[in-house]
Amino acid sequence: MPQHRDPHEQAQVALVLFHVGPYRAALEARHVLAMTDHPTALRTANAQSLLYAGSDPESPPSRWLTLRDAQTVSDNGGTWQLGVSGDFTLQQLPANTLYPLPKLLFPRRFSTALCGFTFDQQQLVLLLDARKLSP
């Protein structure tokens, strides 16, 4: 028997939220394969250095997100790890609260991975496209 959804029920998007310098950022959880305290992949990158070219990280990464390498077209699907400072959280946010980057800001963005924004507990969260991140 098919299940019927409540028309008032909003679609949710699972996000992994973390800090990058003074900002909070998020990746869609479907792109995060694992979350660990120590790097285990051959290829790693610090989120702050990766997103802010020429910026020295305030502190070394304390957590690691394992991501599928979008640049690698191998059968085994290579992975790499993104180092973040502080804790990360897995949260479900309503899809209608995720906003694309406005056209005027798009050419001025600091990273090609920046694709939108949302708010969590009245704090701005930068939405990143994991497929555009690479070490």
Functional labels for PLM-detected ranges:
Residues 1-135:
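An acidic, low-aromatic, low-complexity terminal/linker signal
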